[in-house]
Amino acid sequence: MSPGVEALLEQARSGLQRLTPHETVAAVRGGALLIDTRTERHRREQGDLPGAIVIDRTVLEWRLDPASPWRIPEATGYDREIVVVCRHGYSSSLAAASLQTLGLRRATDMIGGVQGWISAGLPLSEHPADVRP
């Protein structure tokens, strides 16, 4: 019998130094990439985060792997700090663990996702999202 998704999530998080929303703000100010993997519908419902780059979860690894021909220009090296966010902080943990497996050792996610950001009273963006194909 499979150990289940909770065990998978626990294993993924065991290798992450997850950040609070306020720690995420500080990390982004220090140069970390803030990557939003939420769908357009969820971004419309919750709002966009200032400075976030929106990348669809299905292509995340290709866009952030510095060795990939499909990387975004900001994917400059394996030592780049990356903070992944989703709605509630579950799928972002799995995504960050996958990025670490690629060699992006400083990839992590934000505790509580965008809902945690909102609950912490942090501002949402007043500008259109930076959506990358």
Predicted segments — roles?
Residues 1-33, 40-81, 90-133:
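Rhodanese-like catalytic fold shared by cysteine-dependent sulfurtransferases
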